[in-house]
Swiss-Prot record:
Its main location: cytoplasm. This is Protein GrpE. Belongs to the GrpE family. Signal peptide: none annotated. Residues 13-23 have a biased composition (Polar residues). One of its GO terms (cellular component) is cytoplasm. The keyword Cytoplasm applies. Keywords: Chaperone, Cytoplasm, Stress response. One of its GO terms (molecular function) is protein-folding chaperone binding. PANTHER family: GRPE PROTEIN (PTHR21237), GRPE PROTEIN HOMOLOG, MITOCHONDRIAL (PTHR21237:SF23).
Amino acid sequence: MTNKDESVEKNTESTVEVTNVKQNIDDSVEQTEESKGHLQDEAIEETSDENVIEEIDPKDQKINELQQLADENEEKYLRLYAEFENYKRRIQKENEINKTYQAQRVLTDILPAIDNIERALQIEGDDETFKSLQKGVQMVHESLINALKDNGLEVIKTEGEAFDPNIHQAVVQDDNPDFESGEITQELQKGYKLKDRVLRPSMVKVNQ
């Protein structure tokens, strides 16, 4: 093969290589354009989806706002209802306490009169007039005590009971073999309670 032929062959190969390179470049450009087209399509689809979401959101947002408002109103109602119930219970309790205190003051003022009536009933006499008068006083005493008991007054138990400093007041110590140590042997003055409140402790003699 001559030098001329070799030169022609080399030129032909170079031309083929250039053609191949150009083809590769064209293919790459085409692929790039296709990829770009796909990306644009996806972007358009996403934009469309966003537009749909934006179109739906206002309605859903309004529903959510109304639901939130309803929940808040329900919570406020329940809180106010609970506060009102607590207020009613507190007022009722205060009224009961006030009634108890009012009755306590009245009954405390009456106790000395009851003591005097009971002392009068302990007086002995043979005169018929005296006995008749004493019987009338006794009836008044019983009626008064029953009325006070109906309103919560209670006589504190004493003789034979164990001494309780919450309701008893020890005035004298006793040494009586018929009673246990700490037992009350004698009541010196009656004590009274109004329900769970001590109006006046009983004055007692306690066995040592």
